[in-house]
């Protein structure tokens, strides 16, 4: 298994699919990385040479991925909560942030139903 950005990449899958195991790299970005390095997207990781894996590692290193990206997203959410803006309040209360209805639905965000006390 190749190790890129601190993640074990599966050897038996195509390069594009294997790169998506890295947090912050989706299908589109994986295709861009393959195009920039000249690596065949349909080739399996086990068939790549060490130089090609190093090229992929260097190209992925140009992006914010894994722990840094998680930290960045959490800091942005925390900043919204500290500002006390509408989006921050919704995050703080554990409700949908992007304008979805909450009278019905939104069970994932709100958690399990709480019984009404009488």
Curated annotation (Swiss-Prot):
- Region Disordered: start-end pairs: 94-118
User: GO CC terms for this protein?
Assistant: cytosol; small ribosomal subunit
How is this protein named in the record? Small ribosomal subunit protein uS13
Q: How does it assemble?
A: Part of the 30S ribosomal subunit. Forms a loose heterodimer with protein S19. Forms two bridges to the 50S subunit in the 70S ribosome.
Name a GO molecular-function annotation.
Answer: structural constituent of ribosome
Which Pfam families does the record associate with it? Ribosomal_S13
Task: Give the family from UniProt.
Answer: Belongs to the universal ribosomal protein uS13 family.
The source's domain of life comes to Bacteria
Keywords of the record = Ribonucleoprotein, Ribosomal protein, RNA-binding, rRNA-binding, tRNA-binding
- InterPro entries, per database record: Rbsml_uS13_C, Ribosomal_uS13, Ribosomal_uS13-like_H2TH, Ribosomal_uS13_bac-type, Ribosomal_uS13_CS
Q: Which HAMAP family match?
A: Ribosomal_uS13 (MF_01315)
Q: Does the keyword tRNA-binding apply?
A: yes
Q: What are the BP-aspect GO terms?
A: translation
The residues forming the signal peptide are none
State its role: Located at the top of the head of the 30S subunit, it contacts several helices of the 16S rRNA. In the 70S ribosome it contacts the 23S rRNA (bridge B1a) and protein L5 of the 50S subunit (bridge B1b), connecting the 2 subunits; these bridges are implicated in subunit movement. Contacts the tRNAs in the A and P-sites.
